[in-house]
């Protein structure tokens, strides 16, 4: 009788052991399946992201076809004695061109310090600035801090001239990615001085003045080099 009980107990323990083993194998199989699924999902998302990013880049303007110079300048009319009698300028073209040599070095340094302090160090995009802005956006929900370099701003104003009509975040992100891509390409073929000169002749400085020379005339009634 005891042997019968012992045999039954052994069978019961064997069944429990097998059941436990099968449960453990099922859990291991589930974990493996979950792990493989997560890897596949990550690969899929990565491929989708790369494909989307490539599509955005492929649709960007060709760097050889763009012009980073300002789009409009003021026109002056003179009488037969050479005296200026009238100034003609569209609302967004009140601009008087000057060379970088005519712009005081102190003004150049001030603009760089405010707009893009690592202008002479980066290759068109400021990775540190992008990371800083990203961290601030994630931690505080504040997306107001920009990370656009002087080169990017120049492209925004002189190449992506329709940015003011953007109505969706997708349009803004698409343009921003294209700006970053083109900024790197532009800096491969254009020196920093040329970029800065065009920027200082482009920027809107208020009161209808575009560029530092127009602003000097507008606010101080003198030339920027005076």
What does each model-identified segment do?
Residues 1-78, 118, 138:
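N-terminal type II signal-anchor transmembrane helix
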Residues 2-7, 72-74, 78-226:
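Peptidoglycan glycan-strand catalytic modules in the bacterial/periplasmic cell-wall system
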């Amino acid at each position: 009788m005891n042997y019968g009980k012992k045999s039954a107990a052994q069978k019961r323990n064997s069944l429990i052991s097998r059941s436990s083993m099968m449960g453990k194998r099922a859990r291991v199989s589930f974990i493996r399946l979950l792990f493989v699924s997560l890897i596949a999902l990550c690969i899929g998302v990565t491929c989708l992201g790369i494909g989307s990013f490539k599509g955005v880049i492929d649709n960007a303007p060709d760097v050889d076809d763009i012009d980073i110079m300002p789009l409009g300048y003021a026109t002056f009319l003179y009488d037969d004695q050479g005296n200026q009698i009238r100034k003609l300028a569209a609302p967004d073209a009140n601009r008087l061109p000057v060379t970088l040599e005519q712009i005081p070095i102190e003004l150049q340094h001030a603009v760089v310090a405010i707009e893009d302090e690592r202008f002479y160090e980066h290759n068109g995009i400021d990775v540190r600035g992008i990371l800083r802005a990203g961290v601030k956006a994630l931690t505080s929900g504040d997306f107001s801090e920009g990370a656009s370099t002087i080169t990017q701003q120049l492209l925004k104003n002189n190449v992506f001239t329709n940015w003011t009509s953007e109505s969706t975040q997708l349009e803004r992100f698409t343009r921003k990615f294209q700006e970053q891509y083109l900024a790197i390409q532009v800096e491969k073929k254009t020196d920093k001085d040329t970029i800065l000169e065009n920027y200082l002749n482009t920027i809107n400085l208020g009161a209808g003045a575009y560029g530092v020379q127009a602003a000097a005339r507008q606010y101080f009634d003198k030339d920027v080099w005076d």
